[in-house]
Swiss-Prot record:
Catalytic residues, chain numbering: S172, D439, H466
The keyword Signal is assigned to this record: yes
E.C. number: 3.4.-.-
Family classification: Belongs to the peptidase S28 family.
Signal peptide: 1-16
The protein's name: Prolyl carboxy peptidase like protein 5
Residues bearing glycans: N125, N332, N407
Gene Ontology molecular function: dipeptidyl-peptidase activity; serine-type exopeptidase activity
Source organism of this protein record: Caenorhabditis elegans
Gene Ontology annotations of biological process type: proteolysis
InterPro entries: AB_hydrolase_fold, Peptidase_S28, Ser_carbopepase_S28_SKS
UniProt keyword list: Glycoprotein, Hydrolase, Protease, Serine protease, Signal
SUPFAM superfamilies: alpha/beta-Hydrolases (SSF53474)
């Protein structure tokens, strides 16, 4: 979310099982200095129970964290990132707002990795090999890890932090976690910035299942793409794929890797999915300056892509070339790639840089069932693959996880809404929910308008893509995001003061 993989894409693709390396630990607390870009931190591990909710065993694992106390002063706040579906490095690099706040707030900066992602593997190399292991991968288990982590930092790791305020930060699925962290553990977390968090995107949340592609299409059309150009492109690909000469033309035009050459007319499906995935991902990271979160991209990449599709192509070849220019901008803007590997069963997806390709699919095959599909014209400019059904999705889950003894009863479409709330969060407090109008995941956000309800704030960034406000300050930032970050900063300061006032009261 956060950074999420489209469920429609998952239905059409499979991924290879990746076994991750064990973290190298020394006495259970391996640590060393690291830096990513301009951000510096200590990497370490703390011991966490594999099952914090049961009292049947004492099994533990090494949970990874990043810590920076360069600007921390005794009693200062702890800015706590709730790690989401990927290795921790990517989120530390792309959550500059926390790093920017640390000097002003005299704060410690903490990132804690989500269990089963990155180096936080409860069963080391066996974590993904059996449902008896992978079954411990869930949002509620991760939240318990975070709660334990706060106690570790306050009591053992950060000097004088026993009464420090804790402010949770997260984007996408991490934003959902930061909000739920505050809701589930209000005695531990004093406030949360939940950016681009689709907290109401569950089976029973009553959001349109095709809203993601509706927003993707809106973003591209608003940026200058011609709807007919895109739709003619799909038709052109289908027609060209029917002949040997047409497939050869597409193999050359798209510079397809030998692993993903078009060999028959049905192969066009994976090429179309490859293009669609790039467009859906590009809409998420449509920032006003060059970035490399999911892929190296120029400023306002959707606008740049639409320069190639401002008018319908006059021939099938021209229409196919328009889509090629869009997909090549996403996957190869730097020009470093000589070929495109488009078959997702054999190649990385648009989200490959996040790592752990099977972790999030497993969560969507158990607790995080999020209906998502395209319905075609007039909703979007993709092809129709709606309706989303649990039965159809269960087939994907069985295909992907049957080798580790998964069965269809583990797909629980109502689990997420039951655990956290499918349509409302009545116990929420001290949370800022920020969503971007340009971000497809805003369709399942807390609200679609600016609103204040008690101490819960909803804010919409009209020029905002996926958790834009969490990124660090940049010379090309919009004035809008500067104002939103200023508002969020004031909210955080208010929560810190409330914590100090309440701590004094009970001294």
């Amino acid at each position: 979310m956060n950074i999420f993989i489209s469920l429609a894409i998952l239905i059409a693709t499979t991924h290879c099982l990746t076994l991750l390396r064990d973290p190298v630990t020394q006495n259970g607390a391996s640590k060393f200095e690291k830096s990513i870009g301009k951000y510096k931190y200590e990497e370490g591990y703390l011991k966490a129970p594999i099952d914090p909710f049961a009292f049947t065993n004492d099994l533990e694992f090494d949970l990874r964290y990043f810590l920076n106390i360069d600007h921390y002063e005794t009693g200062g706040p702890i800015l706590f990132y709730t790690g989401n579906e990927g290795s921790l490095e990517a989120f530390a690099e792309n959550t500059g707002f926390m790093w920017d706040l640390a000097p002003e707030l005299k704060a410690a900066v903490v990132f804690v990795e989500h269990r089963f992602y990155g180096k936080s593997q409860p069963f080391k190399n066996e974590s993904y090999t059996d449902i008896r292991h992978l079954g411990y991968l869930s949002s509620q288990q991760a939240l318990a890890d975070f709660a334990l982590s706060v106690q570790f930092f306050k009591n053992e790791k950060i000097k004088g932090a026993q009464k420090s305020a804790v402010i949770a930060f997260g984007g996408s699925y991490g934003g959902m976690l930061s909000a739920w962290f505050r809701i589930k553990y209000p005695h531990i977390v004093d406030g949360a910035i939940a950016a681009s968090a689709p907290v109401f995107w569950f089976t029973d949340s009553n959001i349109p299942e095709d809203v993601y592609d509706f927003i993707v299409t809106r973003a591209f059309l608003d940026a200058g793409c011609n709807r007919k150009a895109i739709e003619k492109g799909w038709i052109a690909l289908d027609e060209l794929a029917k002949s040997d000469s047409g497939r050869q033309y597409l193999n050359v035009l798209y510079k397809l890797d030998p692993k993903s050459k078009l060999e028959n007319k049905d192969d066009i499906g994976f090429l179309k999915q490859y293009i669609r995935e790039s467009m859906e991902a590009m809409a998420m990271v449509n920032y006003p300056y060059p970035t490399s979160f999911l892929s190296s991209l120029p400023a306002w990449p959707v606008k740049e892509a639409c320069k190639s599709a401002s008018q319908p192509g006059k021939t099938q070849e021209e229409s196919a070339e328009q889509l090629y220019k869009i997909v090549n901008l996403y996957y190869n803007y730097t020009g470093d790639k000589s070929t495109h590997c488009a078959n997702a069963a054999k190649c990385d997806s648009a989200y490959g840089s996040l790592g752990d390709p099977l972790g999030w699919p497993f969560q969507t095959c158990t607790e995080m069932v999020m209906p998502l599909c395209g319905s075609g014209y007039p909703n979007d400019f993709f092809w129709k693959d709606c309706p989303f059904t649990s039965e159809k999705y269960a087939e994907f889950c069985m295909q992907t996880f049957s080798s580790i003894h998964y069965n269809k009863t583990l797909l629980r479409p109502l689990a997420g809404g039951l655990a956290f709330g499918a349509t409302s969060l009545p116990s929420a407090s001290n949370i800022v929910f920020s969503n971007g109008y340009l971000d497809p995941w805003s369709g399942g956000g807390y609200d679609h308008s600016d609103k204040v309800q008690g101490s819960v704030i909803s804010v919409i960034l009209k020029q905002g893509a996926h958790h834009y406000d969490l990124r660090g300050a940049h010379p090309q930032d919009t004035e809008e995001v500067k104002k939103v970050r200023a508002m969020e900063t004031q909210a955080i300061k208010k929560w810190i003061k409330e914590k100090a006032r309440n701590s004094w009261r009970y001294d």
